[in-house]
């Protein structure tokens, strides 16, 4: 089989021979040559078409092999459209043999262009007549080009775009066209789809994640079940699918396994369900509203009714009750429960409802919990392990509710006289981080008095928020150090959040012991207080307006405290010597040492300047502006002298010596060559200057003699288009 360049050369040879035979002298010789050439041309055309078809098939096979191996294809050169039209007989149906062979440079430019058009690019020779110039173009093409489907990655499947998952392979052949229409529009389908008979409503089930139902009839309600995560109901009978109403359609955000029985309207609205749901027969309307359920629900045989209480238990995390008692209304409201709930068989009253935000393990002792009052509800934000002693908790009062934001381990010892009373004192220690007292020594005067009296309880509550060790640097206040040392600071002047082991002394001092400067006493608690590492001038002045903030010492006392010296023993203090009326006032701090003026290195005075302040210095001599090149002022001086004549000046030198004329910097940088301005241009320049002189003379004459104002021209007037103005000039000149 011949190659394509040899084939094209043969065709060109035949055409050139035909053109040489056409120039024969006699008509009989030309007719004989034409008949012989036409017969040979028909045979040659059939043979060449067969070669082209065989070669095209072979090239397609080679392209498929190369595309499978991901190798770039190099196009073979194609025929020129003119010679292809000769083969097709579109140029009159005559083909002439050449007299002389044609050399290679006389061929089509496609032979030298490997990216030119070819017959293998399109299907038929008719389509290949139109040459598509793709030289330098044809970008953005990846893979094998077949027809007109560019930018296609992967395996194409008829009408199912955007289908992710396992497609059904058991469709009957009769319904394949209908299913192609329905399957096309099912966007965002993730998982395994249903493959029995389905109608058009199955098309629109958006955002389906998981395994769908396998019943035969899928109605319009199941179509729209959005955001379904998990395994749906797999009832096999057609009657079960009939119960799927509009309610089952809208069950949004379902995570877990749904029940396999009759799905009523209640199952529709259970939003945000995480875990395993109940699998009993009748799910009432109350089951609908239990939102945010995380964990395993009860699987007992409570088939009668689940009351409204079960419906409203929001934000339940963990394992719910599995007992068979009646669930009262109080059970409903235990919101935000994290951990394991109580599993005893006592009646839980309305007070248990409100223990919000409980993190950890609740009490599971066998004590009598019948009378847990309303106060047990309110222990909010408890993080850690609660009390697990077996004391009598009948009288847990209202104060147990309010111990807010306790992080760590609570007291697990026996409380005062059997732990019957927990008063305000335990409640009020806010924002305590660390380990509380866990000793069971009830002989301590301070602890016994604190737990038994509400007055000392108020004092315990006022322990301020203190973080560890204060700063001991002496001079400047660093905001950046404050940002690192107080990461959770809210109000800097509150001495916030104590980390470590706190020593409980009753009554406590109003401020913890610290050595160092009074850091955050005069800081503004705004949101920009930690933005700069230095104090502003205003803050520096405010420190001196109130008191000197730079001190070293130990603060041990309250405000207006009498009868106490600097070196008292804290362990031997008696609580009776403190007056309760001044407990919440902050007194002047005690200082161990001598307070003096702040230290300054050197003398504070005017700012220093190195050198003499004076006029700005200039290096060299200030002179006229510099010009790069040679200034040619011949024509410029002529123009200025013309201006001097217009202004009726006697001497042109006086005009050139004027300061206004000198101040006009010439708009020329460089050297002006003489050959740039020809004689013709110079003559036109002189003519323009003369016209300008005449125009200005006319304006001056009209303005001076007739006292008339003629507006000047704004812009630039071309010297070649002064026809109408010349008539006006001539009329004025005649006057």
UniProtKB/Swiss-Prot annotation:
<feature type="propeptide">
    <location>
        <begin position="519"/>
        <end position="546"/>
    </location>
</feature>
<feature type="propeptide">
    <location>
        <begin position="556"/>
        <end position="585"/>
    </location>
</feature>
<dbReference type="GO" id="GO:0007218">
    <property type="term" value="P:neuropeptide signaling pathway"/>
</dbReference>
<feature type="propeptide">
    <location>
        <begin position="363"/>
        <end position="377"/>
    </location>
</feature>
<keyword id="KW-0964">Secreted</keyword>
<feature type="propeptide">
    <location>
        <begin position="321"/>
        <end position="332"/>
    </location>
</feature>
<feature type="modified residue" description="Isoleucine amide">
    <location>
        <position position="515"/>
    </location>
</feature>
<keyword id="KW-0873">Pyrrolidone carboxylic acid</keyword>
<feature type="propeptide">
    <location>
        <begin position="298"/>
        <end position="311"/>
    </location>
</feature>
<dbReference type="GO" id="GO:0005576">
    <property type="term" value="C:extracellular region"/>
</dbReference>
<feature type="modified residue" description="Phenylalanine amide">
    <location>
        <position position="190"/>
    </location>
</feature>
<feature type="modified residue" description="Pyrrolidone carboxylic acid">
    <location>
        <position position="462"/>
    </location>
</feature>
<feature type="modified residue" description="Phenylalanine amide">
    <location>
        <position position="229"/>
    </location>
</feature>
<feature type="region of interest" description="Disordered">
    <location>
        <begin position="352"/>
        <end position="373"/>
    </location>
</feature>
<feature type="modified residue" description="Valine amide">
    <location>
        <position position="619"/>
    </location>
</feature>
<feature type="propeptide">
    <location>
        <begin position="715"/>
        <end position="735"/>
    </location>
</feature>
<feature type="modified residue" description="Phenylalanine amide">
    <location>
        <position position="209"/>
    </location>
</feature>
<feature type="compositionally biased region" description="Low complexity">
    <location>
        <begin position="33"/>
        <end position="65"/>
    </location>
</feature>
<feature type="modified residue" description="Valine amide">
    <location>
        <position position="714"/>
    </location>
</feature>
<feature type="modified residue" description="Isoleucine amide">
    <location>
        <position position="628"/>
    </location>
</feature>
<feature type="modified residue" description="Phenylalanine amide">
    <location>
        <position position="383"/>
    </location>
</feature>
<protein>
    <recommendedName>
        <fullName>MIP-related peptides</fullName>
    </recommendedName>
</protein>
<feature type="propeptide">
    <location>
        <begin position="21"/>
        <end position="135"/>
    </location>
</feature>
<feature type="compositionally biased region" description="Basic and acidic residues">
    <location>
        <begin position="438"/>
        <end position="447"/>
    </location>
</feature>
<feature type="propeptide" description="Linker peptide">
    <location>
        <begin position="214"/>
        <end position="229"/>
    </location>
</feature>
<feature type="modified residue" description="Pyrrolidone carboxylic acid">
    <location>
        <position position="664"/>
    </location>
</feature>
<keyword id="KW-0027">Amidation</keyword>
<feature type="propeptide">
    <location>
        <begin position="437"/>
        <end position="461"/>
    </location>
</feature>
<feature type="modified residue" description="Isoleucine amide">
    <location>
        <position position="669"/>
    </location>
</feature>
<keyword id="KW-0732">Signal</keyword>
<feature type="modified residue" description="Valine amide">
    <location>
        <position position="592"/>
    </location>
</feature>
<feature type="modified residue" description="Phenylalanine amide">
    <location>
        <position position="164"/>
    </location>
</feature>
<feature type="modified residue" description="Phenylalanine amide">
    <location>
        <position position="407"/>
    </location>
</feature>
<feature type="modified residue" description="Leucine amide">
    <location>
        <position position="601"/>
    </location>
</feature>
<feature type="modified residue" description="Pyrrolidone carboxylic acid">
    <location>
        <position position="494"/>
    </location>
</feature>
<feature type="compositionally biased region" description="Polar residues">
    <location>
        <begin position="101"/>
        <end position="125"/>
    </location>
</feature>
<feature type="modified residue" description="Phenylalanine amide">
    <location>
        <position position="317"/>
    </location>
</feature>
<feature type="modified residue" description="Phenylalanine amide">
    <location>
        <position position="467"/>
    </location>
</feature>
<feature type="compositionally biased region" description="Polar residues">
    <location>
        <begin position="66"/>
        <end position="76"/>
    </location>
</feature>
<feature type="modified residue" description="Methionine amide">
    <location>
        <position position="552"/>
    </location>
</feature>
<feature type="propeptide" description="Linker peptide">
    <location>
        <begin position="632"/>
        <end position="661"/>
    </location>
</feature>
<feature type="region of interest" description="Disordered">
    <location>
        <begin position="229"/>
        <end position="251"/>
    </location>
</feature>
């Amino acid at each position: 089989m011949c190659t394509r360049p040899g084939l094209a050369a043969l065709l060109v040879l035949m055409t050139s021979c035909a053109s040489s035979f056409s120039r024969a002298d006699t008509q009989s010789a030309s007719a004989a040559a034409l008949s012989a050439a036409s017969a040979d041309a028909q045979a040659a055309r059939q043979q060449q078409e067969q070669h082209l078809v065989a070669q095209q098939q072979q090239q397609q096979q080679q392209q498929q092999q190369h595309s499978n191996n991901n190798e770039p294809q190099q196009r073979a050169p194609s025929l020129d459209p003119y010679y292809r039209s000769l083969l097709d007989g579109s140029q009159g149906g005559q083909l002439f043999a050449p007299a002389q062979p044609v050399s290679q440079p006389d061929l089509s430019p496609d032979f030298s262009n490997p990216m030119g058009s070819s017959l293998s690019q399109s299907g038929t020779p008719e389509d290949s007549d139109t040459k598509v110039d793709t030289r330098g173009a044809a970008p953005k093409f990846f893979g094998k080009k077949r027809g007109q489907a560019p930018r296609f990655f992967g395996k194409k499947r008829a009408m199912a775009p955007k289908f992710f998952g396992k497609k059904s392979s058991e469709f009957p052949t009769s319904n394949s066209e209908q299913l192609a229409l329905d399957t096309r529009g099912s966007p965002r389908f993730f998982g395994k789809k249903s493959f029995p008979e389905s109608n058009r409503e199955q098309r629109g089930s958006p955002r389906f994640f998981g395994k769908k139902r396998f019943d035969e009839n899928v109605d319009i309600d199941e179509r729209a079940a959005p955001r379904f995560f998990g395994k749906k109901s797999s009832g096999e009978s057609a009657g079960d699918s009939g119960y799927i109403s509009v309610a089952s359609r809208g069950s949004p955000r379902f995570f877990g396994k749904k029940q396999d029985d009759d799905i009523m309207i209640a199952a529709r609205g259970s939003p945000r369900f995480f875990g395993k749901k109940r699998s009993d027969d009748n799910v009432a309307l109350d089951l609908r509203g239990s939102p945010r359920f995380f964990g395993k629900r009860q699987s007992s045989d409570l088939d009668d009714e689940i009351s409204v209480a079960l419906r409203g238990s929001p934000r339940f995390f963990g394992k719910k009750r599995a007992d068979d008692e009646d669930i009262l209304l109080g059970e409903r409201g235990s919101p935000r429960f994290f951990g394991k709930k109580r599993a005893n068989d006592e009646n839980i009253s309305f007070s248990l409802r409100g223990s919000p935000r409980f993190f950890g393990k609740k009490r599971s002792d066998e004590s009598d919990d019948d009378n847990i009052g309303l106060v047990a509800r309110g222990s909010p934000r408890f993080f850690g392990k609660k009390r697990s002693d077996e004391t009598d908790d009948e009288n847990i009062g209202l104060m147990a509710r309010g111990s807010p934001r306790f992080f760590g381990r609570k007291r697990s010892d026996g409380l005062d006289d059997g732990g019957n009373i927990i008063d305000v004192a335990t409640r009020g220690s806010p924002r305590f981080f660390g380990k509380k007292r866990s000793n069971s020594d009830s002989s301590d005067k301070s602890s016994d008095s604190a737990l038994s009296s509400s007055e000392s309880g108020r004092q315990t509550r006022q322990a301020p928020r203190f973080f560890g060790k204060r700063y001991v640097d002496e001079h400047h206040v660093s905001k950046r150090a404050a940002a690192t040392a107080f990461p959770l600071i809210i109000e800097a002047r509150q001495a916030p959040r104590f980390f470590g082991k706190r020593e409980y002394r009753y009554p406590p001092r109003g401020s913890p012991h610290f050595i160092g400067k009074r850091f955050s006493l005069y800081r503004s608690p705004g949101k920009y207080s930690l933005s700069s590492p230095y104090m502003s001038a205003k803050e520096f002045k405010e420190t001196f307006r109130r008191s000197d903030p730079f001190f070293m010492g130990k603060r041990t006392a309250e405000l207006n405290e009498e009868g106490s010296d600097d070196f008292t023993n804290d362990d031997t203090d008696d609580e009776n010597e403190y007056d309760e009326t001044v407990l919440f006032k902050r007194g002047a701090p005690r200082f161990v040492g001598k307070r003096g003026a702040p230290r300054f290195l050197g003398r504070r005075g005017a700012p220093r300047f190195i050198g003499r302040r004076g006029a700005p210095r200039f290096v060299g001599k200030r002179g006229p502006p510099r010009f790069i090149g040679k200034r040619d002022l011949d024509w410029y001086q002529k123009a200025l002298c013309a201006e001097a004549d217009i202004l009726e000046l006697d001497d042109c030198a006086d005009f050139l010596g004027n300061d206004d004329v000198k101040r006009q910097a010439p708009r020329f940088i460089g050297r002006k060559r003489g050959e740039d301005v020809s004689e013709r241009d110079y003559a036109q320049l002189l003519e323009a200057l003369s016209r300008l002189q005449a125009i200005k003379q006319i304006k001056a004459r009209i303005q001076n003699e007739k006292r008339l104002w003629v507006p000047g021209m704004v812009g630039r007037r071309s010297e070649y288009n002064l026809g109408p103005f010349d008539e006006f000039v001539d009329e004025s000149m005649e006057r």
